[in-house]
């Protein structure tokens, strides 16, 4: 996979930020790792964390919407692995559209840590395990927190 163009931002000054982190439990091993990495990243940056879990990716937007009412930034983590039906496309499109709409409607940044992969190997490679080439739980958290700070500084 290409990391070309990936910004070199590994931390932000998150003291004073409240970050909501919600993760699905479907594809549990992968989602547990994304969840743990998001929490670790937010806490390492000094943010207060409010965390919760949902069953699947389709449940993420409604909980993100609720968290956006009280948080400075919200991170949604999940893992949708393509199967043999078009259900994958419907879930991925619905979740992405929902998370984007919530961010735009609420003015609260939403980090999208929902993996949409063709197989479990691709998901593991992006979930921040030892040996993974990417850490999307951490990356989504940094992106959401950074955006919250940018918005805070704008007139």
UniProtKB/Swiss-Prot annotation:
Which catalysed reactions does the entry list for this protein? Answer: (2S)-2-hydroxy-3-oxobutyl phosphate + 5-amino-6-(D-ribitylamino)uracil = 6,7-dimethyl-8-(1-D-ribityl)lumazine + phosphate + 2 H2O + H(+)
Biological pathway = Cofactor biosynthesis; riboflavin biosynthesis; riboflavin from 2-hydroxy-3-oxobutyl phosphate and 5-amino-6-(D-ribitylamino)uracil: step 1/2
Q: Name one GO molecular function term.
A: 6,7-dimethyl-8-ribityllumazine synthase activity
The entry's 5-amino-6-(D-ribitylamino)uracil-binding residues are 26, 57-59, 79-81, 112
Q: What is its EC number?
A: 2.5.1.78
Q: Does the keyword Transferase apply?
A: yes
Q: Which GO terms describe its cellular component?
A: cytosol; riboflavin synthase complex
Cite a single Pfam family from the UniProt record: DMRL_synthase
Q: Where are the transmembrane segments?
A: none
Note the InterPro entries from the entry. LS, LS/RS, LS/RS_sf
Q: Which residues bind (2S)-2-hydroxy-3-oxobutyl phosphate?
A: 84-85, 126
Q: Which residues form the active site?
A: 87
Q: Give the SUPFAM superfamilies listed for this entry.
A: Lumazine synthase
UniProt keyword terms in alphabetical order: Riboflavin biosynthesis, Transferase
Keyword Nucleus recorded: no
What family does the database annotate?
A: Belongs to the DMRL synthase family.
Q: What does this protein do?
A: Catalyzes the formation of 6,7-dimethyl-8-ribityllumazine by condensation of 5-amino-6-(D-ribitylamino)uracil with 3,4-dihydroxy-2-butanone 4-phosphate. This is the penultimate step in the biosynthesis of riboflavin.
NCBIfam families from the entry?
lumazine-synth
Q: What is this protein called?
A: 6,7-dimethyl-8-ribityllumazine synthase
């Amino acid at each position: 996979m290409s990391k070309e163009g990936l910004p070199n931002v590994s931390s932000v000054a998150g003291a004073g930020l409240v970050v909501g982190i919600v993760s699905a439990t479907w594809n549990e091993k992968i989602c547990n790792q994304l969840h743990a990495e998001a929490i670790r990243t937010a806490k390492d940056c000094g943010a207060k964390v409010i965390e919760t879990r949902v069953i699947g990716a389709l449940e993420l937007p409604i909980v993100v919407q609720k968290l956006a009412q009280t948080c400075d930034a919200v991170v949604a983590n999940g893992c949708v692995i393509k199967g043999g039906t078009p259900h994958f496309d419907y879930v991925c499109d619905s979740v992405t559209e929902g998370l984007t709409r919530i961010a735009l409607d609420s003015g609260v940044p939403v980090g999208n840590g929902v993996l949409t992969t063709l197989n479990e190997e691709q998901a593991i490679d992006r979930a921040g395990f030892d040996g993974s080439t990417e850490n999307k739980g951490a990356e989504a958290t940094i992106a959401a927190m950074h955006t919250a700070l940018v918005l805070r500084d704008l007139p």
